[in-house]
Amino acid sequence: MATLLVLHGPNLNLLGTREPGTYGSTTLGQINQDLERRAREAGHHLLHLQSNAEYELIDRIHAARDEGVDFIIINPAAFTHTSVALRDALLAVSIPFIEVHLSNVHKREPFRHHSYFSDVAVGVICGLGATGYRLALESALEQLQRP
């Protein structure tokens, strides 16, 4: 049984009501419930955290190593374009991760085109709405099966 951690960055607690034309109408609670169910059905354990505070996400990444987390799925949200500290935390713990974005960041403002995570992530999923989280989970579980 693997343990997976899903991290949601700033403002994702507002999903379902925040700019639904961009981010969809699915709530964060619905996303988390779906991922928990899918992981459980596959025989795995899924943890999740949403925070608007960079340091809380960093602390959670550090704790993940001590807890034996096998894979991280992260939507860094606005921290994607600004947080060297989150990038360094992910590199420090050496836990593979997939970067997820609900919107297609490449169709948005130019400042959103740069990610501090993409070049060190196992993969990046963007623009598929809440489905992107499900696809990230499926990919993570598949990768954990590999020798």
Curated annotation (Swiss-Prot):
InterPro entries: DHquinase_II, DHquinase_II_CS, DHquinase_II_sf. It catalyses: 3-dehydroquinate = 3-dehydroshikimate + H2O. It comes from the Bacteria. GO terms for molecular function: 3-dehydroquinate dehydratase activity. Substrate binds at residues 75, 81, 88, 102-103, 112. Its EC number is 4.2.1.10. The keyword Coiled coil does not apply. GO terms for biological process: amino acid biosynthetic process; aromatic amino acid family biosynthetic process; chorismate biosynthetic process; quinate catabolic process. The record marks 18 as: Transition state stabilizer. Pathway: Metabolic intermediate biosynthesis; chorismate biosynthesis; chorismate from D-erythrose 4-phosphate and phosphoenolpyruvate: step 3/7. Pfam families: DHquinase_II. The active site is at 23 (proton acceptor), 101 (proton donor). Keywords: Amino-acid biosynthesis, Aromatic amino acid biosynthesis, Lyase. Catalyzes a trans-dehydration via an enolate intermediate. Homododecamer. Belongs to the type-II 3-dehydroquinase family. This is 3-dehydroquinate dehydratase 1. The gene is aroQ1.
